[in-house]
Amino acid sequence: IGSPKLSELAKGKENVVIICSDHTRPVPSKHIIPFMLKEIREGNPDAKITLLIATGFHRATTREELVGKFGEEIVDNECIAIHDSQDMDAMANIGTLPSGAPLLINKIAANADLLVSEGFIETHFFAGFSGGRKSILPGVSSKVTVLGNHCSKFIDSPYSRTGILEGNPIHKDMIAASKMAHQKYIVNVIIDADKKVVHAVAGDAIEAHAAGCKFLQDYCQVVPKKAADIAISTNGGYPLDQNMYQSVKGMTAAEAAAKDDGILIMVSNCGDGHGGEGFYEALKNCSSPADLMAEILKVPQDQTKPDQWEYQIQCRILMQHKVIYVMCEEHRKMAQEMGFAVANDVNEALEMAIKEKGKDAHISIIPDGVSVMVKKPE
């Protein structure tokens, strides 16, 4: 899409870098990367190829995880480097983003003659969609750049929502990062709930990604007939329902489906608890979500804290909605400390909500809040 074949792009390029997704992404890399390597070597048999693992803000990928992702043959025979966003010596400053934040990316990517990437496209609760340009930012960017991109001003934008790209300031910076880094070509897939590929796009980093997002929007967008008094959502079950931090994403689907004062019921096991110390402490210690939000919005872009965006989005939800958690018994007291109501099961949560909203309350049920794109009813 919008690009010559990868083999054509590789001609005359000595130093080729393929940015690859890390262990947190269910990308079928062992089926994608061999074809990308083959194409590159068809165009230039002598190309030096590096697989750069886009860990973003995550921990390093282990050898065992690499083998699971790529297979023994690729791990044993290809040059693989793992990005570390904390290692400033490994970064190159390649310019300033539209937001004013510096764009510091991994030197391996910055020094490439040809920079390409693989990945997958799914809905994203503040970048609109994952994939494409996200291989650069946050994928191979420094901590400074990632935090700047996730600043409170950007998260506060009404356009920083699931499925929205136009007007989204986070996306705007990511697109700029892609262009400044000269990300030339992508192979991105879309997968279903069973982790099977249902669609793939390849080509120009911007055009192919846009085409993939359009497919996904048509594939999974739901427009409720009317806003709900009570909206029930989940985080898709294991492994995405292990903690409250992760569960914010599924909660945003219920937020989109509900009236401004609607009650949200979040069904998520959260067996690992809160999932982020900063996330937990911020919500536990605030006098109210509104007061915490006011403090967050005062934080300058260059002083953004890790996890700040997650508790900012959680605050936004709690300022508008009562949230009832249906979760494991072990962590219910902690959830109450953070400002949530809790229930033993869905029936009890529904009884609590109906008691407030009445027997004629309109109820929306979202079986998997992380894989559906809910467009707010008009």
Q: What positions do the PLM features span?
A:
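Histidine-anchored nucleotide/phosphate-binding helix
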Residues: R25-D46, S247-A257
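Short glycine-rich or small-residue beta-strand-to-loop segments that form or flank ligand, phosphate
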Residues: N15-P26, T50-G56, I232-T234
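Conserved phosphate- and dinucleotide-binding cores of soluble alpha/beta proteins
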Residues: G95-L97, K107-A110, L114-V187, D192-A193, ...
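Membrane-embedded hairpin module used as a gating/binding unit in multi-pass transport
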Residues: S160-Y238
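Structural motif
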Residues: V17-I19, V116-E118, D229-T234, I265, ...
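Glycine-rich phosphate/diphosphate-binding loops that line cofactor/substrate pockets in enzymes
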Residues: I1-V17, R41-A47, A181, V222-I230, ...
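An acidic, phosphate/nucleotide-engaging active-site surface
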Residues: T61-F129
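C-terminal non-catalytic interaction/assembly regions of soluble proteins
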Residues: S247-V248, T252-E378
